[in-house]
Amino acid sequence: MQPSTLQALTKRVLATQHVSNDDYCILKRFGLWWHDAPITLYTDGEQILIKTPCYKEGIKLNTALVLAVKENNYDLIVLFTEWGANINYALLSVNKEHTRNLCRKLGAKEGLEASEVLRFFFETKRHKTSSNIILCHELFSNNPFLQNVNMVELRMIIYWELKDLTTNLIVNEDSFTEMLTKYWYGIAVKYNLKEAIQYFCQEYEHLNEWRLICALSFNNVFDLHEICNTMNIDMNINKMMRLACMRDNNFLTIYYCFALGADINRAMYGSVSNFRIENMFFCMDLGADVFEESLELAERHGYSVIVDILSLKIYKANPILLSKETDPEKINTLLKNYYPKNMLAYDICNVDNYL
């Protein structure tokens, strides 16, 4: 959407330019100033993002509008609307009658449909940066508009985003606010958004175990290392390994738990039980040798593929993995694009049999 006035267009063009510190007075005069710093506008594909030192990674134009409304910043409400922000979304954070009247003058409706609230929620959360995730948490926590949406639909959105979690701690018994807090915290860990992780860690100490579970589930060995070295962990290492093994291809966090002393045979047995074939092969690479027990378990579950795999007597540990390294950078380098040696041996055996 193009700005509606020449002045708004001029401001938009100016906001895309590099301006030296000496000319900041021009930006202030044009109203391109927010949180004691200049506003920068840039495009990322089809979306418009607003940058300030507080939001150096950028936030969407509609999100910036909602924040400006929350702060009752009338000049920026008008400016962002002229730049194309949807003034109806202002209703999500309006907290003063004077601001509500301004939004009406700019064309805002009297209320938002539940579908519109969900659309804004869905669009806003797509921008995976620390500043945006923290802002989403602040905007949506205790927001009365979210109480009116279809809770089943909202929970489905959250479950889908966190579908790789190995345990479901976002349960129906959680309060609505607690559910959302866990959601944003989980997103921060999933995408290793360090500033957001630190924010939630400081604000919600009672969710330390949730952070640990997310790190294990999302294969975030960097955060797992920090948790194990800076926090008191009230979880057995074998339970940590079990959580890591429940999602296939979680080689980084499986290896880290192995390096800390987790029982690799128990990990292989659990991988077989949950039909995590890649993890099973990786456990073999790490020295697991409970082949007969795992074969019997696979037969009981009717896992014919695993029965076929374990019927072969060709598997052995990969020596390069047995050093038990705990440096996350070295682990990441070691296992980046790693293909289990024993899986390769099985593949070769299958090809030979086929030929």
UniProtKB/Swiss-Prot annotation:
What InterPro entries would the database entry show? Answer: ASFV_MGF360
Q: Where are the ANK repeats?
A: 60-92
* GO BP annotations, alphabetical order: taxis
Report keywords, A-Z.
ANK repeat
Superkingdom of the source species: Viruses
Instruction: Name the family the entry cites.
Output: Belongs to the asfivirus MGF 360 family.
Q: What is known about what this protein does? A: Plays a role in virus cell tropism, and may be required for efficient virus replication in macrophages.
Q: What is this protein called?
A: Protein MGF 360-3L
